[in-house]
Amino acid sequence: MKIAVACGGTGGHIFPGLATADILRQRGHDITLWLAGKDVETPAVKDWAGPVVTVQAEGLPSGFSLRAVRAAWRLLRAARACRRIMRPNRPDVLLAMGSYASVGPVCAALSLGIPVVLHEANVLPGRTISLFSRWATAVAGSFEETRFYLRRKDIVVTGMPIRKELEKAARTIPPHETGRDIFTLLVMGGSRGAHRLNDLVSAAVIQIHKGGHRIRVIHLTGVADEATIRKAYQDAGVNAVVSAFEQDMAPIYAAADIAICRSGASTCAELLDFAVPALQVPYPEATKDHQMVNARAMEKAGAVDVVPERDLSLPWLTDYIVGCMQTPGRLARMSAASRSRAMQSAAESLASLVIQVGNGEYGRTV
């Protein structure tokens, strides 16, 4: 079967798309990736050996403006280019991971009568999924709660595909044991970094260390704050590992007693798969506050605590971390809640749905 996978734009679309594409290729299908020509795509697909189609695309700003008109025109031009490329090389089915990068391939597929499978990573559907869900053959999602935000309710909950090396590690690494000799805090600001979060957490950790508590921190700061945060920990004598980013996250998740982090879809999926308790501080500038919606779903499941960034303060954060250090049983319950909600075969589940649609079997009853 020939399958097109539109997963360009951001890491949050590329990596789950690649994870699913790998499974589909392992099952013997011919896979073509459709990307949007963004810088983040190049390193992500460097090990991809299959064909790639790149059609330049960009996001559509909210509201009416000259910039929005230009962006809409470019999206229309991209859709025409996609149709021109797709027509002589018709796939049997298109999997689109959302974002503006999927608009062109989805428009092309629908106009050519090619079945479309959409995947929504977040609880709150983005504009692309909301727009095209009524015409797609199937819509998959990471969260059960997504069905409350779409007109169609037949959402297939597959979970969020994560990078294949992480998924393999999540299945093989033993569950984390709380209550060990030294409490390990993982701090992640997300792909954009998080200056205020970095400052507050580092100050809280230093204060806790000076108070005589044994604490270790693994702090992924983003590029801008790496040197400053590393020096702050060094000057205070804190047991700290500081890096801008980290590719090999499996041993880091395995070591963490709790994470303080954002609540993007990939982060949520990885926390669940590795059963890491977390304090989630949603990125306040996220479109339609979708990270807060993700975090509240995680909180409802008992897997995380949530605090808006505007409510963070040094005294509150210090008390929270110390409280976690003193109540390992509570962290163990959060970890168990994560484990019960995790969907560690998300890429396999999504791949199976795509194959079912491509074979014309989706929705068929025997």
What are these regions (language model features)?
Residues 3-8, 25-74, 223, 310:
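Conserved nucleotide-sugar phosphate-binding/catalytic loop shared by glycosyltransferases and other
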Residues 30, 51, 110-171:
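Active-site-proximal region of nucleotide-activated glycan assembly enzymes
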Residues 39-43, 91-112:
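An aromatic- and histidine-rich active-site surface loop
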Residues 39-48, 171-259, 292-296, 300, ...:
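Donor-nucleotide binding loops and adjacent catalytic segments primarily
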Residues 64-93:
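An amphipathic, basic-hydrophobic alpha-helix
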Residues 91-93, 254-269, 276-277:
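Acidic donor-binding loop of glycosyltransferase active sites
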Residues 330-344:
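A short, well-ordered alpha-helix in the C-terminal region of glycosyltransferases
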Residues 343-366:
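C-terminal alpha-helical cap of glycosyltransferases
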